């Protein structure tokens, strides 16, 4: 089989697609020939600029606040209404509270907010995305973005780590559950990535020094270095891969 990351004719939905890893995914999926719908929360200018950059046709942005309260079903429906089907679901959105928060001072509000955005919304998107894929009867691909924190924990960020560990367990269970439907379910687990979400932390010299000490490759990832394996997992070349946790973190998960 010739090696080609060709997704012509496929319809992809990418969450958190206006910036960072999500925007890199949108670009790569369009370059591979897929039609792409992505959501943004507040960054409308960035979303509009990305659609314009990619030529408009075959790329569509939707404002949606993903927290498990109903926008997820509407977002899946918007993708299907726009392009007629759903073949690929990339769940990239999420929050990482940037300030260290000891468990004894963490508020219930912070805990619930992190779980709502990082976990409840993932459940809802998978639920409605899988229902659509089953109706179509032609299989599909789901890739969830987790984190090194989901595998080894993260001190002072137990809310975030709990959600990222939970989605890893979801991926493992769903990969078996959905295999008969030819719906592949995998996970990509980044560590530190140079994005808007991490910029304030990575710009602090002492904090950056400590972070780089636990990344064997000695630097944070570029968004494109996370998007590339996500793209691969949604192609025919990954046709015997499901239920896997792809550690794309410069080796950080091994030494943290």
Task: Report each predicted region and the residues it spans.
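Short C-terminal tail/terminal secondary-structure segment
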Residues: 2-3, 100, 152, 231, ...
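Conserved glycine-rich Rossmann-like NAD(P)H-binding loop of the short-chain dehydrogenase/reductase
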Residues: 32-49
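Substrate-binding pocket helix/loop in short-chain dehydrogenase/reductase
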Residues: 99-103, 107-115, 211
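Conserved glycine-rich cofactor-binding loop
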Residues: 11, 18-19
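Alpha-helical segment proximal to the catalytic Tyr-Lys
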Residues: 131, 176-180, 239
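Residue(s) in the substrate-gating loop at a strand-loop-helix junction
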Residues: 147
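Active-site helix of classical SDR
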Residues: 126, 163, 171
């Amino acid at each position: 089989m010739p090696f080609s990351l060709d997704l012509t004719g496929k319809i992809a939905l990418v969450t958190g697609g206006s910036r960072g890893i999500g925007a890199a995914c949108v670009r790569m999926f369009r370059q591979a020939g897929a039609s792409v719908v992505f959501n943004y929360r507040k960054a409308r200018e960035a979303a509009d600029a990305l659609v314009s950059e990619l030529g408009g046709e075959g790329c569509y942005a939707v404002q949606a606040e993903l927290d498990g309260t109903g926008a997820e079903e509407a977002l899946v429906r918007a993708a299907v209404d726009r392009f007629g089907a759903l073949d690929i679901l990339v769940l990239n959105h999420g929050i990482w509270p940037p300030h260290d928060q000891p468990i004894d001072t963490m508020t219930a509000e912070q805990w619930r907010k992190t779980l709502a955005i990082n976990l409840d919304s993932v459940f809802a998107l998978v639920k409605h995305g899988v229902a659509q894929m089953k109706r179509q009867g032609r299989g599909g691909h789901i890739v969830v973005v987790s984190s090194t924190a989901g595998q080894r924990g993260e001190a002072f960020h137990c809310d975030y780590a709990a959600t990222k560990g939970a989605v890893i367990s979801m991926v493992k269970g769903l990969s078996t559950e959905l295999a008969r439907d030819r719906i592949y379910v995998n996970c990509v687990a980044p560590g530190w990535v140079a994005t808007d979400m991490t910029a304030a932390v990575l710009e602090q010299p002492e904090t950056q020094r400590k972070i780089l000490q636990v990344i064997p490759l000695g630097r944070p990832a570029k968004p494109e270095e996370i998007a590339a394996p996500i793209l691969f997992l949604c192609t025919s070349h990954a046709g015997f891969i499901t239920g896997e946790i792809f550690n794309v973190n410069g080796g950080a998960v091994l030494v943290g």
